[in-house]
């Protein structure tokens, strides 16, 4: 570990960089407010003393609008129904929750939405009866592909009066795909039996349990992902809470959610980062300080946004006696590609490891097997997210980042290199080398994820301005700040996280 004074200095430099760069984004937002208002129609809002709001983050506005319209009330309804079922007829709670989920789906998506979810789930269930993992995967991928067929999209659009209703159906079917895929693959792992078995394991893979899993409403529209074995086990043996403990969970959970929501709203009122990213001329002309602030603001807003979007279902799951996947870890404590994938969306990571990476061999089949397993995993993530050009580029870059990190780690762990480093470097120097490598990794991690958040053009702009036109001073300054940033992150991980 570093001396206390050095770690404190790194912490102060990191905080100073955050605040200074955020202030630069705030200044640019104010200077170009009129121009951005004309182009993107900033929203008038009384929440923060009349500050205008950047409305260009589609995902945040979409879910907030649906939340205010119906979803909040349907979530409250689920909480009431689930708690009453636990008190009155605990044995039948899964089926009651399933029926409520179907009714809630009908309330927001109508009969066509319920039929589509049932149709996809039933097809996957029927194919899984062949006990073939390959067939089940092909079925899931084909069902997922139907969501992008133009002729099918036109039919689904005619079912609804607004685009938002259509998009809600698309998002719901996309997330449900992972759920019925998990169920199907678990069913494929069960040996076919000549006679029906009354055992819990046999009953768990029945059609009613598939519907209970798929229509569990807290995670119905947007996740997070909970693999079927965990869902079944926890629904069978939930951690029942006393009334006092449940009220405490609600109070703490709502308090956190309100703080996260308030912080997210404050960010889009003070910093028009999404509008600035959508304006190529402004992005090319702002200072490097502002560019750095925009990058940090984008990734931190994405983190806070998902604290809210995953925090609501996580709260309801805890009240149901289930253990939700951990919420995303703060991106300001990430210093590696591996850590980002492991700790941001834990539910999705668990799904990918269990059903894609390990079945393909993972690290058990040598270097080539690892590369192919990792590449296939990232390819599936890109395809599931929508299969756009930006997503394929982002997935390829992240695969490259994970591969290079893994290669460097293996090199440093070879006996020759490890002994050489131990002989010539003190523990403090070893820590500094770790931070230096982490700074390089973090710079690429931020750059590659900006491709996901802003598109390929935004990524090119950052690459050109920071690493090509900005060489050497801007590039080295960024790496210097990230070096300090990495020291703090590594110390935090060693103190609070079991790696």
UniProtKB/Swiss-Prot annotation:
Residues 95-119, 209-223 dip into the membrane without crossing it. Residues 91-155 are annotated as: Essential for palmitoylation of SHH. Its main location: endoplasmic reticulum. Signal peptide: none annotated. It is found in: Endoplasmic reticulum membrane; Golgi apparatus membrane. GO terms for biological process: N-terminal peptidyl-L-cysteine N-palmitoylation; smoothened signaling pathway. It is a multi-pass membrane protein. The chain crosses the membrane at residues 6-22, 68-84, 132-148, 163-183, 250-277, 288-316, 370-386, 390-405, 434-454, 469-487. It is an enzyme of class 2 (transferase). Disruption phenotype: Conditional knockout embryos are characterized by a smaller size and holoprosencephaly at 10.5 dpc, shortening of limbs at 13.5 dpc, and severe short-limb dwarfism at birth. They die soon after birth. Testicular development is significantly impaired in XY embryos by 12.5 dpc. There is a massive reduction in testis size, a reduction in the number of testis cords which are irregular in shape and diameter, and an almost complete absence of Leydig cells. It comes from the Eukaryota. Residues 23-67, 149-162, 278-287, 387-389, 455-468 are lumenal. One of its GO terms (molecular function) is GTP binding. A lipid is attached at residues 188, 248, 330, 416 (S-palmitoyl cysteine). Residues 1-5, 85-94, 120-131, 184-208, 224-249, 317-369, 406-433, 488-499 are cytoplasmic. Its EC number is 2.3.1.-. It holds the Pfam family MBOAT. One of its GO terms (cellular component) is Golgi membrane. Palmitoyl acyltransferase that catalyzes N-terminal palmitoylation of SHH; which is required for SHH signaling during limb development. It also catalyzes N-terminal palmitoylation of DHH. Promotes the transfer of palmitoyl-CoA from the cytoplasmic to the luminal side of the endoplasmic reticulum membrane, where SHH palmitoylation occurs. Plays a role in proper testis cord formation and the differentiation of Leydig cells. This is Protein-cysteine N-palmitoyltransferase HHAT. It comes from Mus musculus (Mouse).
């Amino acid at each position: 570990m570093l001396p206390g004074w050095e770690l404190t200095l790194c912490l102060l430099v990191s905080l100073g960089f955050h605040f200074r760069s955020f202030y630069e984004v705030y200044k640019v937002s104010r200077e170009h407010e009129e121009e951005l208002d004309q182009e993107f129609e900033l929203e008038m809002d009384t929440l923060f003393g009349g500050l205008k709001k950047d409305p260009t983050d589609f995902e945040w506005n979409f879910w907030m609008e649906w939340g205010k319209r119906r979803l909040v009330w349907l979530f409250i309804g689920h909480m009431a129904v689930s708690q009453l079922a636990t008190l009155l007829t605990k044995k039948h709670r899964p089926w009651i929750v399933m029926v409520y989920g179907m009714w809630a789906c009908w309330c927001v998506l109508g009969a066509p939405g319920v039929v589509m979810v049932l149709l996809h789930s039933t097809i996957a269930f029927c194919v899984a009866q062949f006990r073939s993992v390959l067939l089940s995967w092909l079925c899931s991928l084909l069902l997922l592909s139907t969501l992008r067929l133009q002729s099918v999209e036109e039919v689904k659009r005619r079912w609804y009066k607004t685009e938002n209703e259509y998009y809600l159906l698309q998002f719901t079917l996309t997330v449900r795909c992972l759920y019925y895929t998990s169920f199907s693959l678990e069913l494929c792992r069960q040996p076919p039996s000549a006679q029906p078995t009354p055992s819990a394991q046999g009953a768990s893979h029945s059609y009613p349990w598939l519907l209970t899993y798929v229509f569990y409403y807290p995670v119905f529209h947007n996740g997070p992902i909970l693999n079927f074995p965990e869902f079944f086990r926890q629904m069978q043996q939930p951690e029942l809470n006393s009334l006092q403990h449940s009220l405490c969970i609600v109070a703490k959970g709502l308090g956190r959610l309100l703080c996260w929501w308030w912080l997210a709203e404050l960010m889009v009122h003070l910093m028009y980062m999404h509008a600035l990213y959508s304006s190529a001329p402004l992005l090319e002309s702002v200072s490097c300080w502002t560019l750095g602030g925009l990058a940090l603001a984008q990734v931190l807003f994405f983190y806070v946004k998902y604290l809210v979007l995953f925090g609501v279902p996580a709260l309801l799951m805890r009240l149901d006696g289930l253990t939700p996947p951990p919420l995303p870890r703060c991106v300001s404590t990430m210093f590696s590609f591996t850590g980002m994938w492991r700790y941001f969306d834990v539910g999705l990571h668990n799904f990918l490891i269990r059903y894609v990476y390990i079945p393909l061999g993972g690290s058990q089949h040598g270097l080539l097997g690892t590369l192919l397993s990792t590449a296939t995993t990232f390819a599936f993530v890109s395809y599931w997210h929508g299969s756009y050009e930006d997503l394929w580029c982002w997935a390829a870059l992240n695969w490259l980042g994970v591969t290079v990190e893994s290669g460097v780690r293996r090199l440093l762990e070879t006996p020759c290199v490890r002994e050489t480093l131990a002989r010539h470097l003190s523990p403090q120097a070893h820590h500094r080398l770790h931070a230096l490598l982490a700074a390089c990794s973090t710079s690429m991690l931020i750059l590659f994820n900006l491709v996901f958040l802003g598109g390929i053009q935004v990524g090119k702009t950052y690459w050109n301005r920071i690493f090509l036109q900005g060489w050497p001073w801007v590039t080295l300054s960024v790496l210097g700040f990230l070096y300090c940033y990495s020291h703090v992150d590594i110390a935090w991980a060693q103190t609070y996280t079991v790696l």
